[in-house]
Design a protein with these regions (language model features):
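Short, surface-exposed patches at the edges or C-terminal ends of soluble domains, predominantly
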Residues: 12-312
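N-terminal Sec-pathway targeting helices
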Residues: 1-11
Length: 312
C-alpha cells in the first residue's frame, strides 16, 4: 500500500487540507467572457456554497468558472450559512464544490442530516443541483449527500492505463466521442453544433454509479481502475500537521462514471467525480482544466449550467 502526504501546515487541524488546496493559482489569461450568453437580462439565481470548508471558492480555485457563469447571464451568489428550505427559496441552481467534514481526515460528512434533507427536498420540488466531488478526501465528505440521490461515490483515486492524456499519465482521463466514453446527452450535445462537446479531460478524481435512469455522460472504460481509500491519520509534531492515508490495490471501475446527469422528482442533478475539469489553472505542471487546448471542458461547464437551468 502507498502512503500519501496530504498537507503540512502550521494552522488549525481541521483546516489543513482545505487551506493547502484552496489557494491553487488560476489562469488569469483564461477567457471567461461568453460570446452568446444564455441569459441577457436577469438570469436564474445560482447559489454557490462557501460555508463547508470548500476547497475551491469563487475568489480562488473556481474564480474562472464563477466569472464565466456571470458572463453567461446568471446571478451568482455565495453563502456561508447552513442550508435550509428558506435559504434555498428563489434559487434555481445550487453549486456544491469540494465540501469537507470537520474531521481532519475527512471521513465525516460535510453536510448535516438536516441540510441533506433540505437539499433533497428542494431538488425534488424543482431545484437543480451541481455536486462537484473529487478523490479522497472529498468523496467521503460528500457521500451521505450523494446517497440521497442514489449516487454511490467510491471516494478513491481513478486511473485509466488505456484512455489517458499521454503527456500527463494514467490519472489524466480522456473522454471523447472517438473512444466512446463521452456519452450522448443534452449536456454533451449543447444548443447547437458549435456547442457540442467532443473531448473532455479529467484529473484523477473518483468513480461513481447512479440510479436507474441516470445518464453517465462521462463513462469509465473497462480498463479504468479505482484505488479505494484506506485508514487515514493525523500526525502532529510541534506546530506542524500531516494527514496521511494508505490506499488499496486498484479495483475495476469499468462501467462506473465521473459525470452523471439525472432527473430527481421535479428537479435535476449533475454529479461530477472530479473538480479539476472545471478549473482553469496554470502552475508548474502546465495548464489544468477548462484552459487545456484540444479539449472542450469550457463548453462542458457552460452546457452543464444550461441543462440545470433548463436553457437546454
Amino acid at each position: 500500500m502507498r502512503k500519501i502526504v496530504i498537507a503540512v501546515v502550521v494552522i488549525a487541524a481541521a483546516a489543513s487540507f482545505f487551506l493547502l488546496k484552496r489557494d491553487r493559482p488560476y489562469d488569469r489569461s483564461f477567457e471567461t467572457r461568453v460570446a452568446n450568453p444564455a441569459y441577457r437580462d436577469s438570469g436564474p439565481v445560482v447559489l454557490y456554497d462557501e460555508g463547508h470548508r470548500n476547497a475551491h471558492t469563487t475568489s480562488a480555485g473556481y474564480k474562472p468558472l464563477a466569472d464565466m457563469i456571470r458572463s453567461d447571464g446568471y446571478i451568482l451568489r455565495t453563502t456561508s450559512q447552513p442550508f435550509t428550505a428558506q435559504q434555498l427559496g428563489g434559487v434555481s441552481v445550487l453549486v456544491l464544490v469540494l465540501a469537507q467534514g470537520a474531521n481532519p481526515t475527512n471521513d465525516s460528512a460535510a453536510y448535516s442530516d438536516s441540510e441533506t434533507s433540505a437539499i433533497a427536498d428542494w431538488v425534488r420540488g424543482g431545484g437543480s443541483l451541481l455536486l462537484v466531488t473529487d478523490h479522497w478526501p472529498f468523496g467521503l465528505a460528500a457521500r451521505s449527500l450523494a446517497r440521497r440521490f442514489d449516487v454511490d461515490l467510491s471516494g478513491g483515486f481513478a486511473e485509466d492505463p488505456k484512455y489517458h492524456e499521454p503527456d500527463r499519465g494514467e490519472s489524466h482521463l480522456v473522454f471523447s466521442e472517438e473512444n466512446g466514453l463521452l456519452r450522448e446527452h443534452p449536456i454533451t450535445r449543447g444548443r447547437s453544433d458549435a456547442e457540442r462537446v467532443r473531448r473532455v479531460l479529467t484529473f484523477t478524481g473518483q468513480s461513481m454509479t447512479g440510479p436507474p435512469g441516470a445518464v453517465p455522460f462521462l463513462l469509465l472504460s473497462d480498463s479504468a481502475t479505482d484505488r479505494p481509500p484506506g485508514p487515514a491519520r493525523v500526525e502532529r509534531e510541534g506546530g506542524n500537521e500531516r494527514v496521511l492515508m494508505e490506499y488499496g490495490d486498484p479495483q475495476p471501475a469499468g462501467g462506473r462514471a465521473q459525470g452523471i446527469a439525472m432527473e430527481f422528482g421535479g428537479g435535476r442533478v449533475v454529479v461530477l467525480g472530479e473538480a479539476g475539469m472545471l478549473r482553469a489553472q496554470r502552475d508548474r505542471t502546465g495548464l489544468v482544466g477548462m484552459n487545456m487546448p484540444g479539449y472542450d471542458n469550457r463548453q462542458l461547464a457552460l452546457n452543464i449550467m444550461h441543462w440545470l437551468s433548463r436553457a437546454l
